Amino acid sequence: MKKNLIIGAATGYKYGPMKYFFTSLKKIDFDGDIAILVSDKIDEETKNALLAHGVILIYVKSGSIEFTKKYAQSRFWKIHRLPHKLLFKLLNTGKNKLCKLSKYVKIFHLISGSRYCYYYDYLLANRDKYKFILTTDVRDVVFQADPFAGLDGEALHFYEQDDAIRYNSYTSYWIKHAFGKKALAAIEDKKSICSGTTIGSFGRMMDYLEKMITVQAQITGRLTGLGGFDQGVHDYMIYNNYFPGSDVIENPAGEVVTLENLDTVTLTDNQELVNRYNRVIPVVHLYDRYPDLKLKALL
């Protein structure tokens, strides 16, 4: 029987700031696999703590991380648009073009963007092992229930945030710089969709990752050094129908709540967040924005 997988990136964190991600999964008796991207220079305390939780560690070379940070902080991006445009055309050919584009993204994109490449690599190497996959942020996420319960078929779920893109300065910035002012104008009145949490069946997730890798490679010349461009790519692609048949779930009606506004949820006497349908929300994202919030998952 195939398992479900939760996979995320935590290359810059020690165990302490992200411990509730793992302890909350233990509380709900999650029986799938947990795979986390970590630096190959991870400290022993963090490494041992993650292994104690049964986490599968996917090592990312620290040299790659350091290079992309230096590149992002340099002035070279001001003149690199044409060289990268030409490089993308050269790489985007042949049967192994996705492999070439993935390596390219790993070199020039911060981990927020290159994580999709590592997710793809891991899933490709374990293609017969998993039924459903949740790609997720780690440090600011906790679990109240199994996020995969009730899923069936070939699902691909994206999760809205509360505000329209025009009111999210970062998302607007990323879309404008990656795809242009006209592209932003066409979708700026639509809700932002969080790239931090996505759930899909194996086949649908692989298609999503392949397209994310390809389009991120394509816009490499438009990077400006500000991390998070994957959010702009994610939203642009969803609203331009790159993923037909996918579901965009209203916040917080589905498996995930992006906790931007406490007015959209209710805290029960059992210290669990429920949505307006009185259903416990399996995944709570951005819980750390409310330090006084007393959740069962944090106890």
Task: Describe the function of each predicted region.
Residues M1-Y130, G203:
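N-terminal anchoring/stem segment of glycosyltransferases
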Residues Y116-S169:
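GT-A fold catalytic core of metal-dependent nucleotide-sugar glycosyltransferases
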